[in-house]
């Protein structure tokens, strides 16, 4: 009898995607983050589902319902903090996954890369709306400030903002619709992730050398399933350590104060994973310019494949490009730090310089250095 795993229409898809999938023999731990992102997504959907059972999306009771989850629901506190810190783990894995793609030239699979950018935008939108739901001070003012940015769009801006708010300010209607969107978007992310995998399996995985590996493939199971389980263990241990020892480490203390439209917090700032984009937004004195820079800080990834001038795909054997890549990482860390600082000297100028450097590395320095490396190798 033929193995049902290989013949049944449903199990055949799973088999060809996760079991008998031919994978390059030399992919490193940097290729673990795809599966870790899958684990994060499932974890967020499950914890979110249980939170939604007890949460109420009404301005008068939202804050109290979150308190009720933490105090009165059995293991409610662990579900709430796993969900909150799970988002941080999600973004750590996302940034490392994108960084891996930039370093090893994975962007040369344009379909996979572009779906990845759409996924990044969708996850960021979901996380932003989730941050509004506890209805603390930072939730309310974060929602007000970020949605208000849309008013910079000429002609339709003001109408668009009021349409999103469902009124003339962030209120009950805004909270209810944000909850609805926050609930539905993870399932859209799930569908997009499936398309992401579909495109990836059309071409096969890239590998650290950037050289086609068709002549040297190994089955995904057991080699990479074991490797992914090890990565998953590290992820879960890190997440649980965070949840059980310092659950509020990455949060904002202001969010333990119920939302008050009459009292503005001294420093309005988003969660840590948005700080780099927030710093770029703040570094431009013009409102519309700031909004465009904010969008372009992520959208710039879409033109990276067009700016690939090197004869080699990966940066593995390109020391000058490696130096630039790590300068970019340092620059992003600087932007993250600046995003959390008040708008005053010297932080303003540091933020502006770091923002300029970010775009210059990606759009100017990378292509030029790649051409220089080609010439050095007489290619």
From Swiss-Prot:
Single annotated GO MF: metal ion binding
One of the GO BP terms on file: mitochondrial electron transport, ubiquinol to cytochrome c
Binding residues for a ubiquinone: 201
Gene Ontology CC annotation, any one: mitochondrial inner membrane
Binding-site list for heme b b566: 97, 196
Protein's cellular compartments: Mitochondrion inner membrane
InterPro entries from the UniProt entry: Cyt_b/b6_C, Cyt_b/b6_C_sf, Cyt_b/b6_N, Cytb/b6-like_sf, Cytochrome_b, Cytochrome_b_C_euk/bac, Cytochrome_b_N_euk/bac, Di-haem_cyt_TM
Domain of life: Eukaryota
Membrane-crossing residue ranges in chain numbering: 33-53, 77-98, 113-133, 178-198, 226-246, 288-308, 320-340, 347-367
Other comment: Heme 1 (or BL or b562) is low-potential and absorbs at about 562 nm, and heme 2 (or BH or b566) is high-potential and absorbs at about 566 nm.
Subunit-level organization: The cytochrome bc1 complex contains 11 subunits: 3 respiratory subunits (MT-CYB, CYC1 and UQCRFS1), 2 core proteins (UQCRC1 and UQCRC2) and 6 low-molecular weight proteins (UQCRH/QCR6, UQCRB/QCR7, UQCRQ/QCR8, UQCR10/QCR9, UQCR11/QCR10 and a cleavage product of UQCRFS1). This cytochrome bc1 complex then forms a dimer.
Membership in a protein family: Belongs to the cytochrome b family.
UniProt-recorded name of the protein: Cytochrome b
Organism: Vormela peregusna
Gene that this polypeptide is encoded by: MT-CYB
């Amino acid at each position: 009898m033929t193995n049902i795993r290989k013949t049944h229409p449903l199990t055949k898809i799973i088999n060809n995607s996760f079991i008998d999938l031919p994978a390059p023999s030399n992919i490193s731990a940097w290729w673990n983050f795809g599966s870790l992102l899958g684990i994060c997504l499932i974890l967020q959907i499950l914890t979110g589902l249980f939170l939604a059972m007890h949460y109420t999306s009404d301005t008068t009771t939202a804050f109290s319902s979150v308190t009720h989850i933490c105090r009165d629901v059995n293991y409610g506190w662990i579900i709430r903090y796993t969900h909150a810190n799970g988002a941080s783990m999600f973004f750590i894995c996302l940034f490392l996954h994108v960084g891996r793609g930039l370093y090893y030239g994975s962007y040369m699979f344009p379909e996979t890369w572009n779906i990845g950018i759409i996924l990044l935008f969708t996850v960021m939108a979901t996380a932003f709306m989730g941050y509004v739901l506890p209805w603390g001070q930072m939730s309310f003012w974060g929602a007000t400030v970020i949605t208000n940015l849309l008013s910079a769009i000429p002609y339709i801006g003001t109408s668009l903002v009021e349409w999103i708010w469902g009124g003339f300010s962030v209120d009950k209607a805004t909270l209810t619709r944000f909850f609805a969107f926050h609930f539905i978007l993870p399932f859209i992310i799930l569908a997009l992730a499936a398309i992401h995998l579909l495109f990836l399996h059309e071409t096969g995985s890239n590998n650290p050398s950037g050289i086609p590996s068709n002549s040297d493939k190994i089955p995904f199971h057991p080699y990479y399933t074991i490797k992914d389980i090890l990565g998953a263990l590290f992820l879960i241990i890190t997440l649980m350590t965070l949840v059980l020892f310092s659950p509020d480490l990455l949060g904002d203390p202001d969010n333990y104060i119920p939302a008050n439209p009459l009292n503005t917090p001294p420093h309005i700032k988003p969660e840590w994973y948005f700080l780099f984009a927030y710093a770029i937004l703040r570094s431009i004195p013009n409102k519309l310019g700031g909004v465009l820079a904010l969008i372009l800080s992520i959208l710039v990834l879409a033109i990276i494949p067009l700016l690939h001038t090197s004869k080699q795909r990966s940066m593995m054997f390109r020391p000058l490009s490696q130096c630039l890549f790590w300068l970019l990482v340092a620059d992003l860390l600087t932007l993250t730090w600046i995003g959390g600082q008040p708008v005053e000297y010297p932080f303003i100028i540091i933020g502006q310089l770091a923002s300029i450097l970010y775009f210059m590395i990606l759009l100017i320095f990378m292509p030029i250095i790649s051409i220089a490396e080609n010439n050095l190798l007489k290619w």
